[in-house]
Amino acid sequence: MSDQTVIERIRQHDVLNVGVSLGFKGLSFRNVLHNCWEGFDIDLARAVAVAVLGDVGKIHYMPLQSGDRFRALRDGVIDLGSFNSSITFQREAESDVSFVHPMLFDGEVLMTPASNLLEPVEQALYTRERRIAAMRGSTTEENLKRYFGHLNLSCEIRLFDSPTQARQAYQQGECNIYCLDSYLLAGERAQLQDKEAHIILQDRISLEAMSPAVSSHDTQWLKAVTWIMRTLIEAENLQVTSKNILEMSQEATGYLHTFLYPSEQHCKNLGLRPDFIRAIIHQVGNYGEIFQRNLGKYSELNQPRRDNNLWSQGGMLYSPLFI
């Protein structure tokens, strides 16, 4: 195994290799019209590219099936996994990967045709049939077994390797329920021609914390990506945006100045550019900007932030201090 650090390898090749999902609207989705990748997970990766290479464009995206994601990290095929993965005990214990910081709190929900409901009550308890499409290699199968066992309802879970396969099985009637994290499922529903005929039920199967992932073997890289993610959250907490960053960096005093102008030695220790915080905010934006343009009110999905508000606004997002 090479003694080269991940950051040294990235800089040598002048590109960040990022593993992404096979395509979820709002999270990581290839825009064929503009020939580019878009989404919440993509913007998190862009922030890392800015911090290390100074350029949001120096990324090579590698779409991966759920079952291949952590192997690609372990083997060094990718430098960063930004594929909407849930933090779990088993994954960190078995896969030689580390999750950096919770960046999206979400939970699995269910979508079904309105015709599959016994009564006009939007709950799983009132579904006629339960052939459920879910993703292979995710946490969904175990969560579904536990949830429907609790309801004392039988169900048949069918696993698929890609969202396209799962969505097609659902559309063709092979499955009559589709289970995904709520933000992902909103994106899948948006792609249905008759989306108004499909209902996302009130049931919430789980609450999970999603995070980018890195190999456990390089502590510098783990720390670097962790603090890059925290930069996005703390920038929103301090109300620094891509629109006001130039003005605020000129006028900054006290803690805001400490945040925007971190010690050069500290940046060097983490392998980051000395201006990485200001560059990230300028080129990518803060957490709120990223959420709203990909998942929230400025996106086609128009989803509420729910738990993904700052702690000061009743949400679960928090960053340790930059001191």
Residue ranges and their predicted role:
Residues 1, 7, 50-52, 114-118, ...:
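Extended ligand-binding regions for polar small-molecule ligands
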Residues 2-84, 283, 287, 310:
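Extracytoplasmic small-molecule ligand-binding "clamshell" domains
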Residues 6, 45, 68-73, 163-169, ...:
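Short, hydrophobic alpha-helical packing/hinge segments within bilobed ligand-binding/sensory domains
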Residues 11, 49-54, 78, 145, ...:
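Sec-exported extracytoplasmic/periplasmic mature domains
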Residues 17-26, 34-52, 109-161, 165:
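Bilobed "Venus flytrap"/periplasmic-binding protein-like clamshell domains
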Residues 46, 50, 54, 58-126, ...:
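Acidic, polar ligand-binding/catalytic clefts
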Residues 95, 104, 140, 148-149, ...:
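Soluble extramembrane regions of membrane proteins in the secretory/endomembrane system
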Residues 260-323:
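C-terminal functional modules
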